[in-house]
Amino acid sequence: MTWISEDTWQSEEVRVDFVTGCRNPRDFFWAFITLLGSVGFLLVAASSYLHKNFLSFISSEFDSELIRFLPQGATITVYGTAGLFVSLFLWLTIFWNVGSGYDLFDKKRGIVCIFRYGFPGKNRRIFIRVLINDIQSLIIQSKKENKKEGRYLRSGVLYMQTREQGAIPLTAVDDSWNPPKIAQKAGDLSKLLRVPIEIF
């Protein structure tokens, strides 16, 4: 029983891959930037509507008379409000840790269990159970980049192809991994599950 990477634990017959989900630095960055931008827009809109400088902490020379409330201030209010809703959505996905979970590969019992957290409600906990004998192959859906020297694999997403449930993603579909990392995971799983790897 050893940790083979920061998010993978493996013994001879069991492997557990832990999935981070929405609590990664990129998601925190975008949630913070969206919140900051939308609050800035709303402060400018409030300054133009009330003819007061709510941005004095940034610049004492800001003249609220430069931006009339109709139509510029009203438009900025709409953008600021929309930004607040987007920011709220991003912060809630981080709070609920949507997409996090684990992949359990148990050769001894002959099963693969995939668990993910979703949004609150009926699908808050998503649990998929697959028999190892039902797995046909591992699929790397690659994203290639054309350069002068030729085509290169830029990133990819790993799927597990099953007979009954079709292709099940093992990595986040919107978060493509770099080639060495996805090749390493696919190779390790192929060896453990004794299934071929297909690249598309």
Swiss-Prot record:
Quote the protein name from its UniProt record.
Answer: Photosystem I assembly protein Ycf4
Sorted alphabetically, the keyword list is:
Chloroplast, Membrane, Photosynthesis, Plastid, Thylakoid, Transmembrane, Transmembrane helix
* Function description: Seems to be required for the assembly of the photosystem I complex.
Q: Which organism is it from?
A: Lotus japonicus
Its transmembrane ranges are 28-50, 76-98
Q: Which Pfam families match?
A: Ycf4 (PF02392)
Q: Name one GO cellular component term.
A: photosystem I
Domain of life where this protein originates: Eukaryota
Identify its membrane topology class: Multi-pass membrane protein
One of its GO biological process terms is: photosynthesis
